[in-house]
């Protein structure tokens, strides 16, 4: 099957959606053509000439040519924004060489806040709904996102979840003192990394052995570094450069925590949180935020905890400081949970069966 993936999230861009789509392409045994903004990279990439959003007519002409030149069977939209703008126009395209002028099927993967924010903009809401209604099927990464979308569109919505590449790594759980807490994240306010610094500071002031490692970059980087500079706890900042850097990071920590919080009264939320699953795949206990689909990435009390505020975050970290043997128990439970419910093999089977059944 020849699949045209239209996306605003592709290498060299980083982030959860970009990581998800690259892994999807690597694991799906079909030919992919990638169409996106002028800066996308790759052997099968077709960068637009700076017209991806500002010139929809040129976008349509580009896609029409790609579809015909590459005998595209289906169009897969990598996310809802800005792709919802193209759906209705692309519904005029036929499957190449189709004797019956069959319309080319369109599918979309929706993640979380990228569609929910649009739904709260009055001018955009109706346009979003009308375009989503013209898709064959919408796939979501979490049950939370599926339920949110069901209020926006009548199109069939299927939660396919996420997939994680399980690392070839066995955690020996031998060095849990000091407790090294890690977070992999964009450094933005919604991730509440400042909470981690504040709580770690308080625990260090109480004489407990604790350190904090932060991997990522973003708007709050300078603010968080200033906060760390007056903290009692040792905070290390790392910028992710390669997959090996991320791999080494997960191997160097004992506990993963990212207490994300929804913003604007729930308009912007965590669609799922791939980093929670990545951390669990390394055999780490995980503390998630009470935001969107994040709570679907753990089994509370068995693989991690949900921290909706700083007090609960502190209690959750204290649990592992006071019960170090639970680090291994929770970590092993978490790795088993990810292997059972978040393998790429299961996701691909689910995705392909639903695409094939509709074609």
Predicted regions and their residues:
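Conserved donor-binding/catalytic core segment of Leloir-type glycosyltransferases
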Residues: 6, 174-191, 197-201, 213
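Short His-centered aromatic/hydrophobic patch
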Residues: 77-83, 110
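Donor nucleotide-sugar binding/catalytic pocket of nucleotide-sugar-dependent glycosyltransferases
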Residues: 108, 133-169
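Nucleotide-activated donor-binding/catalytic signature segment of Leloir-type glycosyltransferases, i.e.
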Residues: 224-247, 255
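Acidic donor-binding loop of glycosyltransferase active sites
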Residues: 251-269, 284
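Short hydrophobic beta-strand element within catalytic cores of glycosyltransferases
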Residues: 276, 280-281, 285-288, 298
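Conserved acidic donor-binding segment of nucleotide-sugar-dependent glycosyltransferases
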Residues: 299-311, 319-325
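A short, well-ordered alpha-helix in the C-terminal region of glycosyltransferases
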Residues: 319, 326-341, 347, 353, ...
């Amino acid at each position: 099957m020849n699949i045209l993936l239209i996306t605003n999230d592709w290498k060299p861009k980083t982030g959860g959606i970009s990581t998800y789509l690259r892994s999807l392409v690597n694991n799906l045994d079909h030919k992919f053509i990638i169409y996106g903004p002028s800066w996308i990279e790759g052997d099968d990439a077709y960068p637009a000439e700076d017209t991806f959003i500002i010139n929809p007519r040129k976008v349509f002409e580009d896609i029409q040519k790609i579809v015909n030149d590459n005998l595209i069977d289906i169009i897969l939209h990598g996310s809802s924004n800005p792709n919802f703008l193209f759906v209705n126009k692309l519904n005029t395209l036929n499957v190449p060489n189709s004797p019956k002028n069959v319309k080319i099927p369109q599918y979309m993967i929706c993640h979380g806040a990228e569609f929910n924010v649009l739904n709260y903009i009055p001018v955009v809401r109706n346009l979003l709904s009308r375009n989503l209604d013209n898709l064959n099927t919408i796939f979501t990464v979490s049950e939370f996102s599926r339920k949110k979308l069901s209020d926006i569109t009548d199109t069939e919505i299927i939660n396919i979840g996420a997939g994680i590449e399980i690392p070839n790594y066995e955690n020996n759980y031998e060095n849990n003192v000091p407790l090294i807490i890690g977070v992999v994240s964009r450094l933005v306010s919604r991730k509440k990394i400042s909470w981690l610094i504040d709580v770690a500071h308080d625990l260090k002031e109480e004489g407990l052995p604790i350190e904090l490692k932060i991997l990522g970059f973003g708007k709050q980087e300078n603010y968080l570094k200033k906060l760390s500079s007056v903290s009692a706890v040792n905070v290390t900042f790392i910028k992710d450069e390669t997959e090996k850097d991320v791999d080494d990071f997960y191997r160097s920590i004992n506990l993963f925590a990212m207490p994300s919080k929804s913003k604007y009264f729930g308009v912007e939320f965590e669609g799922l949180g791939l980093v929670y699953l990545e951390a669990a795949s390394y055999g780490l206990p995980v503390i998630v935020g009470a935001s969107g689909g994040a709570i679907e990435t753990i089994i509370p009390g068995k693989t991690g905890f949900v921290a909706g505020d700083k007090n609960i975050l502190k209690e959750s970290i204290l649990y592992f400081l006071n019960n170090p043997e639970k680090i291994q128990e929770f970590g092993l439970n978490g790795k088993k949970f990810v292997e059972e419910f978040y393998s790429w093999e299961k996701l691909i089977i689910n995705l392909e069966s639903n695409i094939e059944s509709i074609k």
